[in-house]
């Protein structure tokens, strides 16, 4: 018995030693091995720094850049502001260099053909594993791989078909009219008024997704949207700690608040979905909102898969909750970003504002622009939206990671464990495709369609590409066309003297100091 303490101590020492060796493998030996493999291929980047890699320097440079707005009058070369570290890497080493995300190297890919290839090869270049903080915001379709992704995509697709989008036009209309009427009340009959449109547009798109997702229980949807906005701010404030193992489980004030907000979101969504489930089981028809369409698709597909017999549903109760959260995050944020930069650029380019208004008035007069087919015939408005998406994509880069086996991407041989950042913003401005004026606002590039604009190349990635292209892009574009048309019918607008150009954002490309514009009634 007297040997037991020595045995226990020996076992503890072995466990600690094994843990230490594993940590050294992860934090030192493996990064150095990967660095050698990347440099052998001519890829360049900074030498690996223990644990943090390039993250400290990247964060410092970004904070410095975001501390001041861009000079006025502004141009569209804002990448050095939102990601100065990567901008310096690209200038120093050229396209296809690498940086260190902690102990993981990430190759920066900006050449359009390589971006397209990586998007298309979704089974090899997968989404990185979601950290616990980000998972609180949204998992669902965007985070799934393989068979689960395919099944969920198949179930969600019908909700975004054209005939279903047409059913959501009243939800779009109601929310847009509400905001435009609020603006009109602020503008005197024969004068002008300054309105910061950014809060209004985020509220508008949140309102739209609340109505489109939950229909008759819109009030619950609105409350969920408000809580998700709070949760997003909490997550962003805590992301800097996400590299610390187990940090989210510590009893900090931020973690406690985040848990409470998440529990309330979960409770509200459970109630809404449970009530819908009971109604469907009682024989009521599925609602024509996103949740109703999704639940109906889930039931029908599950029955088909089960040969018509009562079978376990493909999408679980929690899966439905996760997809609803994703509807909110993706559905409101990306559209608000598209709308705000569209209005800002139309302020700067008054000639295009005039052309777009003339087209809207020729198509709708002063009638509400609620005809889906007529909205899609707005050629100039569509050209403008495409050019805004090219210059100010809602998401400027997308991360992927190779988990299994060595593979080639173009001439690069990428070993497993290496990340890649697909710099869609760089591909959208490649001078070889778009010309030397690639950073200038020129909607007429799209006058003869996308294929002509890109000279037959695939070099336009505002919604991603390939099998995982954004499922809600037509939803966002229809909502945006209607909102822009209605605003052009009611107002002329210009930049306020207080406007400062400051694109920023960790997730989407937001105006850091808002978007104060001067409005006049027409």
Swiss-Prot record:
Task: Give cofactor(s), names only.
Answer: heme
In which pathway is this protein known to take part? Secondary metabolite biosynthesis; terpenoid biosynthesis
**Xref: SUPFAM superfamilies:** Cytochrome P450
- Claim: Endoplasmic reticulum is one of the keywords in the record: no
Q: What family is this protein classified in?
A: Belongs to the cytochrome P450 family.
Bilayer-crossing regions: 4-24
Q: Which protein, by its recorded name, is this?
A: Echinocystic acid 23-monooxygenase
* EC number from the UniProt entry: 1.14.14.-
What practical uses are noted? Soapwort saponins possess anticancer properties and are also being explored as enhancers for endosomal escape in targeted tumor therapies. They may also serve as precursors for vaccine adjuvants.
Question: Sugar-bearing residues?
Answer: 190
- For the keyword GTP-binding, the answer is no
Gene Ontology, cellular component aspect: membrane
Output the Gene Ontology terms for molecular function.
heme binding; iron ion binding; monooxygenase activity; oxidoreductase activity, acting on paired donors, with incorporation or reduction of molecular oxygen
This protein's encoding gene: CYP72A984
A Gene Ontology biological process noted in the UniProt record is: saponin biosynthetic process
Q: Which InterPro entries match?
A: Cyt_P450, Cyt_P450_CS, Cyt_P450_E_grp-I, Cyt_P450_sf, Cytochrome_P450_Monooxygen
Location relative to the cell? Membrane
Q: How does it sit in the membrane?
A: Single-pass type II membrane protein
Tissue specificity as recorded in UniProt: Mainly expressed in flowers and flower buds, to a lesser extent in young leaves and, at low levels, in old leaves, stems and roots.
Source species, domain of life: Eukaryota
Gene3D superfamilies to which the protein is assigned, alphabetical: Cytochrome P450
Q: Which PROSITE patterns has this protein been placed in?
A: CYTOCHROME_P450 (PS00086)
């Amino acid at each position: 018995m007297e040997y037991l303490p020595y045995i226990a101590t020996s076992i503890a020492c072995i466990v600690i030693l094994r843990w230490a060796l594993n940590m050294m493998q992860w934090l030192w030996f493996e990064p150095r091995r990967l660095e050698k493999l990347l440099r052998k291929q001519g890829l360049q980047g900074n030498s690996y720094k223990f644990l943090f890699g390039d993250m400290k320097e990247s964060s410092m440079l970004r904070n410095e850049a975001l501390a001041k707005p861009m000079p006025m009058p502004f141009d569209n070369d804002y990448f050095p502001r939102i990601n100065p570290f990567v901008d310096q890497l690209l200038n120093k080493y050229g396209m296809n260099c690498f940086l260190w995300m902690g102990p993981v190297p990430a190759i920066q890919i900006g050449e359009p053909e390589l971006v397209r290839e990586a998007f298309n090869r979704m089974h090899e270049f997968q989404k990185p594993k979601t950290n616990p903080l980000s998972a609180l915001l949204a998992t669902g379709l965007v985070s799934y791989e393989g068979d689960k992704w395919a099944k969920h995509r198949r179930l969600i697709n019908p909700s975004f078909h054209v005939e279903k989008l047409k059913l959501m036009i009243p939800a779009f209309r109601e929310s847009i009219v509400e905001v435009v009427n609020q603006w009109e009340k602020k503008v005197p009959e024969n004068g002008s008024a300054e309105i910061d449109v950014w809060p209004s547009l985020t509220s508008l798109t949140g309102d739209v997704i609340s109505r489109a997702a939950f229909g008759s229980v819109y009030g619950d949807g609105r409350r969920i949207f408000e809580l998700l906005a709070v949760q997003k701010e909490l997550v962003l404030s805590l992301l800097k700690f996400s590299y610390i193992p187990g940090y989210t489980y510590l009893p900090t004030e931020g973690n406690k608040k985040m848990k409470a907000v998440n529990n309330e979101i979960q409770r509200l969504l459970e109630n809404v979905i449970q009530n819908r489930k009971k109604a469907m089981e009682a024989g009521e028809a599925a609602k024509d909102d996103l949740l109703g369409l999704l639940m109906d698709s889930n039931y029908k597909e599950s029955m088909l898969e089960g040969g018509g017999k009562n079978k376990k549903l493909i999408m679980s109760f929690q899966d439905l909750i996760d997809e609803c959260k994703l509807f909110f995050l993706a559905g409101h944020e990306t559209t608000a970003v598209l709308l705000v930069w569209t209005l800002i650029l139309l302020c700067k380019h008054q000639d295009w504002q005039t052309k777009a208004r003339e087209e809207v008035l020729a198509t709708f007069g002063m009638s509400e622009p609620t005809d889906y087919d007529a909205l899609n015939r707005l050629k100039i408005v569509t050209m403008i939206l495409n050019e805004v998406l090219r210059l100010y994509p809602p998401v400027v880069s997308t991360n992927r990671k190779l988990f299994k086996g060595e593979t080639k991407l173009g001439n690069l041989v990428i070993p497993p464990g290496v990340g890649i950042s697909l710099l869609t913003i760089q591909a959208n401005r490649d001078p070889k495709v778009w010309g030397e004026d690639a950073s200038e606002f020129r909607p007429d590039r799209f006058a003869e369609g996308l294929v002509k604009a890109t000279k037959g190349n695939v070099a336009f990635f505002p919604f991603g590409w390939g099998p995982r292209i954004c499922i809600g892009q037509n939803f966002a574009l229809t909502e945006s066309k209607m909102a822009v048309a209605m605003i052009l019918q009611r107002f002329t607008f210009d930049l306020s003297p207080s406007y400062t150009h400051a694109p920023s954002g960790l997730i989407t490309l937001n105006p850091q100091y808002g978007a104060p514009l001067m409005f006049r009634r027409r």
